[in-house]
Amino acid sequence: MEACNCIEPQWPADELLMKYQYISDFFIALAYFSIPLELIYFVKKSAVFPYRWVLVQFGAFIVLCGATHLINLWTFSMHSRTVAIVMTTAKVLTAVVSCATALMLVHIIPDLLSVKTRELFLKNKAAELDREMGLIRTQEETGRHVRMLTHEIRSTLDRHTILKTTLVELGRTLALEECALWMPTRTGLELQLSYTLRQQNPVGYTVPIHLPVINQVFSSNRALKISPNSPVARMRPLAGKHMPGEVVAVRVPLLHLSNFQINDWPELSTKRYALMVLMLPSDSARQWHVHELELVEVVADQVAVALSHAAILEESMRARDLLMEQNIALDLARREAETAIRARNDFLAVMNHEMRTPMHAIIALSSLLQETELTPEQRLMVETILKSSHLLATLINDVLDLSRLEDGSLQLEIATFNLHSVFREVHNLIKPVASVKKLSVSLNLAADLPVQAVGDEKRLMQIVLNVVGNAVKFSKEGSISITAFVAKSESLRDFRAPEFFPAQSDNHFYLRVQVKDSGSGINPQDIPKLFTKFAQTQSLATRNSGGSGLGLAICKRFVNLMEGHIWIESEGPGKGCTAIFIVKLGFAERSNESKLPFLTKVQANHVQTNFPGLKVLVMDDNGSVTKGLLVHLGCDVTTVSSIDEFLHVISQEHKVVFMDVCMPGIDGYELAVRIHEKFTKRHERPVLVALTGNIDKMTKENCMRVGMDGVILKPVSVDKMRSVLSELLEHRVLFEAM
């Protein structure tokens, strides 16, 4: 067949196909028109969509596409030219818009792809943030558990409660099957199972401390997983268990307490640790998480701190109990010492009274005998008796003074006195004794030495007299010099007494007294012994000179009371020595000079020798001795032995009454009060004088309180009684210094 170039004739229209095309174009147009509406709705709902103008192009493109399909509905049948023009116009517009949209997509698609990439990045970031939030929540949970456990641990300072609470709280928080604490033994060579979670009284298992697993844990500050078959993990029987739970162990430092020694703790010369072992439930798939291990590590550190605090508290309480026991023992010892001191003082007081009473008789009768006609041999014997008696009386006074100095009951009697007179009186007293040994005694008082001073005149004189007396005693020939002056600030300090810190003031001055002799001297190493009571050096001169060894010991204590210092210098035996002391005295006010409430000494030129006809009443347990003294002085003496007899005999004719206030069964103070009641007028009442052997300050104060006119200490010689009566008749008052 020859080929022909012909056009296939138009096939006849099929009604069914036309119908389907018609319906399809309608729905295509409907879809095209609905899509822009949906885009417009969602763009309005989105506030951040960045491609609104692109959607406008898409909307126009879709609308035009829908319009072509809609117009196409009229082209399936015969249609007019107008329909063809509209159809052509719609397709041209659709072509233009579609091309413009296609060109625009070239720029938009990369942005859209990057949006997807950003979406994936944001998803990854969100997942990472979720993980971090989970970690933060885990840390917060761990921190909450740590705070809770720390609060429970710190709620007590009992070591056993701390450890038991730790195991219980860890077991509850971490849902443990078992938790145990291994403590080092006292030797530090083993670990002993001390506390467990499930067992009330764990058996004291021990394991060597040098096991590899223990060394591994002790060498790290982290919680480490260990084998369930490890010796320190075998805390519970595994019978019937298919798979043991995971086990971790952590060290618990035992902090070094340098100032405390805990009784049941190991020796902490090197760093030591306890071991805490924690086991998860058996037959479970549970494993240890990082935050749980961190919780265990923090709790171990908190337990270490709490244990150190508890140990310190235990040792403090133990030290407190020990201190209380020591205080009780000290208090008991103090009371025993006070009882012993009171017993000693009572004994000394009784012995003082009992010794002075016979001493009074010996001295009184010896002094009476001395004034009678005696042969030279008899006079020598009487003088020896008197000297021995006076020495014994001095020894009694020294013992009592030392006793009161040691128990602190002796106090200085501060008053204004003539300082120059003290040295002159000592010089006058010592000069006759020195002249017998052919010793020259010189007194040098500095020009700037105050005449009046404030201090204890009696004790100062006692110090000077004792020091000068020692110089005379230990010197066979040569001279003795007494020098007194106001010490300058540069000469106050003595390198031998670093504890002596004198302080200068406008209200007081420091008196320096130096007594230098050319006597036997002393070894320098023996000088400290001189100030020890009852101690004597071994030199021949000392042994031959006698003495009780109390003089300088008492002087040192008196000097200390006066805030001073005393020392002795000597180059050796045969080279003499110098005694030096410094005492603190006050400057006297001119308005107070010589205004003393009573007199303590009597001028010799005013003493009467006899008192003929002077009526005296005596009540004394040694009444005959006292009466003998008074009768020898010419007095008319009446003696009584009871209160009733005393009150019956006493009258206005009696000028002086001597009464012993400490006679057995007689209260002398009450008797003095009754005498005052009987004689209401002062000029009618006789002079009341207490004659006593008690030298304590209380006796003197009691006598003054009940209105007595004087106190005289036994023993009394004829000369002393003569001076006493002379003073009483002249001033009607005399209180002998005590």
UniProtKB/Swiss-Prot annotation:
Q: Which residues carry this modification: Phosphohistidine?
A: H353
Function per UniProt? May act early in the ethylene signal transduction pathway, possibly as an ethylene receptor, or as a regulator of the pathway.
Q: How does it sit in the membrane?
A: Multi-pass membrane protein
**What cofactor does this protein call for?**
Cu cation
Q: Decide whether keyword ATP-binding is in the record.
A: yes
Q: Please, which domain of life does this record's source organism belong to?
A: Eukaryota
Regarding how it is modified after translation, the entry says: Activation probably requires a transfer of a phosphate group between a His in the transmitter domain and an Asp of the receiver domain.
**Species lineage:** Eukaryota, Viridiplantae, Streptophyta, Embryophyta, Tracheophyta
* Chief place where the protein resides: endoplasmic reticulum
Enzyme group, top EC level? Answer: transferase
Q: Which chain regions cross the lipid bilayer?
A: 23-43, 54-74, 92-112
Gene Ontology, cellular component aspect: endoplasmic reticulum membrane
> Where does the Response regulatory domain start and stop, copy by copy?
612-729
- Stretches assigned to the Histidine kinase domain: 350-589
List of residues that carry 4-aspartylphosphate = D660
What is written in the cofactor note of this entry?
Binds 1 copper ion per dimer.
Family annotation (Gene3D superfamilies):
1.10.287.130, 3.30.450.40, 3.40.50.2300, Histidine kinase-like ATPase, C-terminal domain (3.30.565.10)
Q: What is its EC number?
A: 2.7.13.3
Point out the gene that encodes the protein.
Answer: ETR1
Q: What is this protein called?
A: Ethylene receptor
Gene Ontology biological process terms from the UniProt entry? negative regulation of ethylene-activated signaling pathway
Q: Which UniProt keywords apply?
A: ATP-binding, Copper, Disulfide bond, Endoplasmic reticulum, Ethylene signaling pathway, Kinase, Membrane, Metal-binding, Nucleotide-binding, Phosphoprotein, Receptor, Transferase, Transmembrane, Transmembrane helix, Two-component regulatory system
* Family of the protein in this entry: Belongs to the ethylene receptor family.
Reaction(s) catalysed by this chain's protein: ATP + protein L-histidine = ADP + protein N-phospho-L-histidine
